[in-house]
Amino acid sequence: YNGGDYPLHQKKELTSQILVLKKKNIKASDYAKRTIDELFPKNVLENTILKQASISESVIAINDGNGNYTIKILPPQVQFSCICGIQCLDVNKDGNLDLVMAGNNFEFKPQYSRLDANYGNVLLGDGKLGFKWQNYSDSGFFIRNEVKHLEVIKDKKGNEFIIAAINNDTPKLYRLNEK
């Protein structure tokens, strides 16, 4: 912002954990206007480990078998929230692997808002590592909850189901189509 790096966290949150800032006894109004360079002593910044993310989209990493990976960005429809559960299986029994995904995270602090725009996604594979998103009405997979995990299970007759583990709620069960 304005050519400077500003803290993302609120003053109370940082001063409760970083003694250097607590000792400065900065007013909240002053804290809001100061850059990272103005808040922290030079020696603290010089000893800071800086990490940088270069990909912010949801992706899959495809291993070529020799430890080399190709990154494929998933379709725009799955980019609206986090993905916490994913299963790779042949949903439509065409011989190609498909992806079933769900997610959301309601545990963020209020200033960041919650990630709640993932309603579950089915991506049909084309056999060439391309995936096409399916409408909810076509896939039958629609789940607005905070899904923490997806698992494929079978009943005694061999019918396949996807069970979604939902935070603070009962699991949901989805039967896969037979073809």
Language-model-derived ranges and their functions:
Residues 1-179:
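Beta-propeller-forming repeat regions
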